[in-house]
């Protein structure tokens, strides 16, 4: 027999190397085959519901790091809630209609106008479903658990029917109307855009100052005076029908050479510098209200422009007199309608100037900028041309600039119930808290929602037209269309004539001959996803409305959060969510947006192959995702190192509880040693802290708390101390079983606590824990216990940990001075202050063992510390090399080796243990 055969050296099949890229898919396959998600739902039947509603990603392309951050965050929450007393179903969704899919088909050579609408839409559907299959595989590879076989998809028949009913509820309340208004228009997509479909990029634009000659100055201004406007869109000058001034501002008439001009008094110096006026002389000062209804000559056409009053005019830029084209701006439209001006758009759907811009017909609007500027110069009306770079709206899909253009569209009136929406926001809990202000301001300031789109792939607007052109939006017709969509899908709209889409026997006084036509436009895709609260939450029996949580990127304050809120309040009177948790964007390591053109993209699949999905999940749990998050391969390398520490600590506990049967070997709390009870109390603290952090969606605190406990409390202290007991003492020694009790409790608790973040690792540990549940995901979160001596233990051991830290400093100095090598070679004498002496009395433990030294003594209170002692605030420490020899079994330096003649190689402690438990060693001796 060898000496090592008498030691309880932990052995385990739990591998040191995780092999995550290879092993994760094996676990994921097992979860699918054993229906672990479904088992969890069954276990939670009858419990309170926690409803996290998945915002649907667009079904186009493989997932990126933003998707991973979002889906993993959701998975952590749902897994935690499922393990902590809630029924928390998770139904993933996909957004499937819209321009990107049409663009993808065009890239594949599909010619929309050369096939029937139904055939084209079928190609769109097939493409969307293929993309869903790709993304579903990607999301499952991240370890995200949910009802993947029954997702919600915005092209599903029942979904489209529910969306039509939401539209019907809004129409019934009078919120839907048809109107000619300026809207964001994408000439590159040939369609209107919602605010959520706009993104801003820097663009170079012309900046021009233009003079309009006064025609009727209302007795205040001479006809040889010029009103000066400033604009960055010269192409809209042909659409000018007015000039707007602020009634409260002061304006001045100034003499410059032989010309007279009018600008806002406060902007005179800036305008003079810009245009190059020398010594402008103020002739008159007056209020904007005095200029109301003056007229000025249009600089290009034989008509006048009306001067109007409105409060939207500011002094931030320009001249204080605003060029007003009611067909090309929201404020322009509002003031123009108030004053009875025509609403004219001078560009067509493709962005080319039309017949309302004589002299420029057929010219692309951006090219027209140059031609119109030249025409103004030829007429003597151009005072200054310059160029500047500014942030300008672009189509979020095509990345091309957009324009404001008046077209006849279908709108959802926000004014009609804006106050109700704002009140609903007050019922919602926001994380971060600034989200409330952001959403509130967006709703407060937003215009009406243009919901019609001039595209093919989407849900048709369920509107008919009578013979006289009167729109038909009636409860009866809308419900009938919803029923048809529920049965056949929205393609039925394109397959049948209008009369076959109307209820049988339907008549309308506006169609005496029974003739009807149908709307050609489709719904805004934000109306699609924004109806999910009714199409999914209210429709599926296992779900509930309103949701407890919507969790998406901060861009969704103007997207899904916004559209869902509007449709929900309109249709049901309440917000669709009780809480909103928003996240920032994922950027590269330098803080730049990831893009293929910059070559700085990192995709989850790459990280999974190199490190594993578990490392992405742990990374998600370490970052503050409430703001933008930087991503680099280095991040994952660092996270992988943090994971290694977690895994190694858990592996040590697995190995050293291998011979521990929790049913028969557990030591009662009251019978544990002081340090063991302290660790149980610390474990109790960890449970409380981690669950509080989970409840607050504070994953970083969850991870930090668990990692710190594993690395600092366990690995660097308790487990290190435990080796002398767990390895050395007899297998069933009460002290050993006590420490194993703590280790097992820590391992079981930590495994449960990390399951939401590291589910693959938790499942790998789980079989070693001998629990009744087949999977960690089917277990419940640990509950904190009540220990009567908790505060007392924390107080004592907090003092001891400070004491230990100072002794370790003294040991480190002794090591540096070559007095000792390892701490087990040390003999430590302390000269403590009275409070430290009392604390050491209270610790009630083997301090030598706790310090991992071979000798420890407390000097008598009357003894003064020698001059060479290491001095600390509350004690002095002397470290010497321990006297004696190293015991080959316990590795301590002992003076009693050989005192037992039967086992002369061992110290008396080891000899007693071996003699009692390994009689063969006594009889035959140890192998050499």
From Swiss-Prot:
What GO CC annotations are associated with the protein?
Answer: cytosol
- Localization terms from the record: Cytoplasm
According to its UniProt entry, this protein's organism is: Lacticaseibacillus casei (strain BL23)
State the InterPro entries in the record: aa-tRNA-synth_I_CS (IPR001412), aa-tRNA-synth_Ia (IPR002300), Anticodon_Ile_BEm (IPR033708), Ile-tRNA-ligase (IPR002301), Ile-tRNA-ligase_type1 (IPR023585), Ile-tRNA_ligase (IPR050081), M/V/L/I-tRNA-synth_anticd-bd (IPR013155), Rossmann-like_a/b/a_fold (IPR014729)
UniProt record, GO biological process: isoleucyl-tRNA aminoacylation
Motif 'HIGH' region in this chain: 57-67
Reproduce the free-text note on domains from the UniProt record. Answer: IleRS has two distinct active sites: one for aminoacylation and one for editing. The misactivated valine is translocated from the active site to the editing site, which sterically excludes the correctly activated isoleucine. The single editing site contains two valyl binding pockets, one specific for each substrate (Val-AMP or Val-tRNA(Ile)).
Q: Which family does it belong to?
A: Belongs to the class-I aminoacyl-tRNA synthetase family. IleS type 1 subfamily.
- Per the UniProt record, which EC number(s) apply here? 6.1.1.5
Known catalytic reactions: tRNA(Ile) + L-isoleucine + ATP = L-isoleucyl-tRNA(Ile) + AMP + diphosphate
Q: How would you classify this enzyme at the top EC level?
A: ligase
Function of the protein: Catalyzes the attachment of isoleucine to tRNA(Ile). As IleRS can inadvertently accommodate and process structurally similar amino acids such as valine, to avoid such errors it has two additional distinct tRNA(Ile)-dependent editing activities. One activity is designated as 'pretransfer' editing and involves the hydrolysis of activated Val-AMP. The other activity is designated 'posttransfer' editing and involves deacylation of mischarged Val-tRNA(Ile).
- What GO annotations for molecular function exist for this entry? aminoacyl-tRNA deacylase activity; ATP binding; isoleucine-tRNA ligase activity; tRNA binding; zinc ion binding
Q: Where does ATP bind?
A: 596
Q: What is this protein called?
A: Isoleucine--tRNA ligase
